[in-house]
Structure formats: C-alpha cells, structure tokens
Design a protein with these regions (language model features):
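Bacterial N-terminal signal peptides that target proteins for export
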Residues: 1-11
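Intrinsic disorder/low-complexity segments
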Residues: 5, 19, 25-27
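Bacterial N-terminal signal peptides
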Residues: 9-22
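Extracytoplasmic metal-acquisition and chelation regions
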Residues: 25-311
Length: 311
C-alpha cells in the first residue's frame, strides 16, 4: 500500500508539473538590459508586458563614465538581450562587463546583442585621422542620436524586430506595439514642431556636444560649446572667447547637462546675460521624466520658456 501511495503521489506531482511548466514557459518575459535609460524607455514602448527591462546608466548620469558595480554583472548574466547606444559611447565601461558576465547570449555579435546606432542617422562623423589632441572625439560619429524623434522611431522599430527574433510567438504583439508607438510619436512630433517653429534659427551654446540631433531636428543653431574640445574641461582662455562669441551673436541661452559643474556656465551667464538652463539629454534625468515623450516635452518646455523670457 505504501508503495502504491508513493506511486500515486509521484504521478500526481508529475501531472501538476506537466501543466505548470508550459504555463511558466509561456509567461516568461524576455529579460532586457540596456546601457542607458533612453534605450530602456524605447524598449519598454515596444516590449510592453512581454519584457522586463532595466538600464545600467541612469538618466542623471554621464553615460560616457559609469562606475562598474557587481550588480551590473548580475543583471547582464541573466539578460536575454543587451541594447547599447554604440559609437563608443560606453567604451570605457561596458565591454569589460559584457566579457565578465560570461553570458554567451549577449556577447558582441551574438543574437542577444543589439547596437542601436545601426538604425540611426549619425551626425558629426569625423573626416580623416582622429587624435587625442582633439579631445574625446567619437571616431564613428556623435552618439547622442536619440534626441532626434526620427531616430527614436528607427530605434524602436529595430528593437521590435529584435524582440520578434528572440520571441517569435509574440512577434505580432511587438509589431502592434511599434505601430501604436509610431502613431503617438508622429502626433507628438507635429505638436513639438509647431511649438518650436517660432524659435527656428535661435542661437544656443551647449556644454558638451550632446545636442546636434535635437538642434538639427528643431532648427536651432549651436554656435559654441563650454568645453574647448569634447571631454576637456573649460579653460579661462576658451571661456573668454566664448563670452565674446555669445555677445557678438546675441545668443540668449546656454544649455548644460545635469552632470556637469555649473560654475563656468553661470559665470558666462553673468557676463553675457544669457540664461543658463539645465536640460535633460536622457529619460530619468528628473523624476517626472519617465518616458521618451516626457523627455521632449520637458526640454522643449524649458527652451520655449527661455526664448520667450529673453525677448
């Protein structure tokens, strides 16, 4: 009797497992890790509830310089898909993490590795040989491409296609999510373009070269940078030249990323009367900016307020 009872229990648990395991497999989400919060925001738009997504760099951090932590390795070891910005933006910290994760799915060239720059229109691609004397110039072009909504659309489409490759059963879901995102983005672009139209041609100065895609899309003229060269801290001589340029060009706005020191920009503002604005290059730079649409709403709102008050 004991043996029969044991067999019955074994069969019972086998049947339970047979029913539960397919359900668990069917409901398992793709585990997506991104290098930046912007890639995470776009992945969430098209992945919906079929993915879990986490970013390594947060929106208030400089994505060029991220301090590696053991927790990052834990995230990468469990990832089904890694999405990075590329163009060597993360070259100082991400490659060692990928290697040390020992996750074959996300190694460079593997099915679970996605460089989003391949989908985008890239600006400021250097001509000729690039040397360290020119600062931290990206030899493959400017990596801050997500600040153009057209590139955001391209990235989202590329991510949706990659998710479909990894999870063919949900391919139609990812395509539908992209189409819905595309409709909302097209409507938002019409609104943003209309809001910015009166300010096309306005001159601005930025701290770092993180603004060219945004500026080109909305018709702004970036006349100079607080950095004398990319990644090089401000120098007294360059600051004096920049102050003279701002006065000569009647520039009214200096834009600074949230992770740079405001001391030099504020001194420039005092000397020229230009407004110094901390704008957000990434989702999550402020708590209320939680998605791709809110990023543009926030930055455009700041710019319009600054342009209006300068007249």
């Amino acid at each position: 009797m004991k043996k029969a009872s044991w067999v019955i229990h074994l069969v019972f648990w086998f049947l339970i497992c047979a029913m539960v395991l397919p359900i668990a497999a069917a409901t398992k989400k793709l585990n997506v890790v991104t290098s930046t919060a912007d890639m995470a925001a776009l992945a969430q738009e098209v992945g919906g509830d079929k993915i879990s997504v986490d970013s390594i760099a947060k929106g208030y951090q400089d994505p060029h310089f991220v301090e590696a932590k053991p927790s990052f390795l834990l995230k990468l070891r469990e990832a089904d898909l890694l999405i990075n910005v590329g163009l060597q933006l993360e070259i100082g910290w991400l490659p060692p993490l990928i290697t040390q994760s020992w996750n074959p799915r996300i190694q460079v060239g593997a099915q679970g590795y996605l460089d989003a720059s391949q989908f985008c229109e890239i600006l400021e691609i250097p001509q000729g040989t690039v040397t360290r004397a020119e600062g931290d110039v990206h030899p493959l072009g400017n990596p801050h491409y997500w600040l153009d909504p057209d590139n955001g659309r391209r990235i989202a489409r590329g991510i949706a296609n990659k998710l479909a490759d990894l999870d063919p059963a949900d391919a139609a879901y990812f395509q539908q999510r992209f189409e819905e995102f595309n409709k909302r983005l097209s409507a938002a672009e019409l609104k943003w373009d209309a809001e910015m139209k009166p300010y096309r041609g306005q001159k601005v100065v930025t701290y770092h070269r993180s603004f060219p895609n945004f500026a080109r899309h909305f018709g702004l003229d970036v006349i100079g940078y607080v950095e004398p060269r990319p990644g090089i801290p401000p120098t007294p001589s360059h600051t004096i030249e920049l102050i003279q340029l701002i006065k000569r060009e009647n520039c009214k706005v200096v834009l600074v990323e949230p992770y740079f020191d405001l001391k030099t920009p504020q001194s420039i503002g005092r000397e020229t009367g230009a407004q110094v604005i901390v704008y957000l290059p990434s989702v999550g730079g402020e708590k209320q900016v939680t998605n791709y649409f809110e990023l543009f709403d926030y930055d455009i709102g700041l710019l319009i307020k600054a342009f209006q008050s300068s007249h």
